[in-house]
Amino acid sequence: MKPTTVSTLRQWKQQGEKFASITAYDFSFARLFADEGIQVMLVGDSLGMVVQGHDSTLPVTLADIVYHTEVVRRGAPAALLLADLPFMSYATPEQTFDSAARLMRAGANMVKLEGGKWLAETVKQLTERAVPVCGHLGLTPQSVNIFGGYKVQGRDAEAADLLLEDALALEAAGMQLLVLECVPVALAKRVTEALSIPVIGIGAGNATDGQILVMHDAFGITGGHIPKFAKNFLAETGDIRAAVRQYVEEVKAGSYPAEQHSFQ
């Protein structure tokens, strides 16, 4: 299979072709996802909650992400593979370069970091050193203690304007992809249309260029609180492969996420 690249995603955006992505943490699921049509995967620090059993992403280490990136890459050699820079792994320029280099050597095509325009210089420096960057705005889980919980972001006009400013500043600094999490549909549409780079949504409505789900949410195996934006595709199909195919098909058709999965 021909490798999926950032250029592929840009072409899809230009053509109005939506795409599905998902988190992956191991070889077998990565291979299954690739077999069923998912070409973009994220080794997310969400593994701290759904794999390791923590109550947040904060305990996840760089070594954790490196390990899971290596095994996911073996399962999906042609996928565009994103890897999270975990909490406090990009606090200084030197630390950032070292962390990013380790993830790229492990098989990542791009590193993802959380934060606004204050990270513009970091994005610029990584890009200049041949490390592609995916940004993450809206609800950024590493900032859960600042937000006071997992809450929808950008609901008032001022917050929405600031988020758009952040997105534009990061794009100008060299960001090549953006994840928007838990923001109102109208704001996600506004950001997606304002940026030339692809935007992936999670809890951001269906106006974004792509969608991403934590795999455990897509299969209904998280237990406890179920996010509003999640849909249990396994419950409807009874088969993991069929569930993945349905997820891909609904994203491409624009039927997922529906209104009940979105914030106004």
Curated annotation (Swiss-Prot):
<keyword id="KW-0808">Transferase</keyword>
<dbReference type="InterPro" id="IPR040442">
    <property type="entry name" value="Pyrv_kinase-like_dom_sf"/>
</dbReference>
<keyword id="KW-0479">Metal-binding</keyword>
<keyword id="KW-0460">Magnesium</keyword>
<comment type="similarity">
    <text>Belongs to the PanB family.</text>
</comment>
<dbReference type="Pfam" id="PF02548">
    <property type="entry name" value="Pantoate_transf"/>
</dbReference>
<dbReference type="GO" id="GO:0000287">
    <property type="term" value="F:magnesium ion binding"/>
</dbReference>
<feature type="binding site">
    <location>
        <begin position="45"/>
        <end position="46"/>
    </location>
    <ligand>
        <name>3-methyl-2-oxobutanoate</name>
    </ligand>
</feature>
<protein>
    <recommendedName>
        <fullName>3-methyl-2-oxobutanoate hydroxymethyltransferase</fullName>
        <ecNumber>2.1.2.11</ecNumber>
    </recommendedName>
</protein>
<feature type="active site" description="Proton acceptor">
    <location>
        <position position="181"/>
    </location>
</feature>
<keyword id="KW-0566">Pantothenate biosynthesis</keyword>
<comment type="function">
    <text>Catalyzes the reversible reaction in which hydroxymethyl group from 5,10-methylenetetrahydrofolate is transferred onto alpha-ketoisovalerate to form ketopantoate.</text>
</comment>
<feature type="binding site">
    <location>
        <position position="84"/>
    </location>
    <ligand>
        <name>3-methyl-2-oxobutanoate</name>
    </ligand>
</feature>
<feature type="binding site">
    <location>
        <position position="112"/>
    </location>
    <ligand>
        <name>3-methyl-2-oxobutanoate</name>
    </ligand>
</feature>
<feature type="binding site">
    <location>
        <position position="45"/>
    </location>
    <ligand>
        <name>Mg(2+)</name>
    </ligand>
</feature>
<dbReference type="GO" id="GO:0003864">
    <property type="term" value="F:3-methyl-2-oxobutanoate hydroxymethyltransferase activity"/>
</dbReference>
<dbReference type="GO" id="GO:0005737">
    <property type="term" value="C:cytoplasm"/>
</dbReference>
<keyword id="KW-0963">Cytoplasm</keyword>
<dbReference type="GO" id="GO:0015940">
    <property type="term" value="P:pantothenate biosynthetic process"/>
</dbReference>
<dbReference type="InterPro" id="IPR015813">
    <property type="entry name" value="Pyrv/PenolPyrv_kinase-like_dom"/>
</dbReference>
<feature type="binding site">
    <location>
        <position position="114"/>
    </location>
    <ligand>
        <name>Mg(2+)</name>
    </ligand>
</feature>
<comment type="pathway">
    <text>Cofactor biosynthesis; (R)-pantothenate biosynthesis; (R)-pantoate from 3-methyl-2-oxobutanoate: step 1/2.</text>
</comment>
<dbReference type="InterPro" id="IPR003700">
    <property type="entry name" value="Pantoate_hydroxy_MeTrfase"/>
</dbReference>
<comment type="subunit">
    <text>Homodecamer; pentamer of dimers.</text>
</comment>
<feature type="binding site">
    <location>
        <position position="84"/>
    </location>
    <ligand>
        <name>Mg(2+)</name>
    </ligand>
</feature>
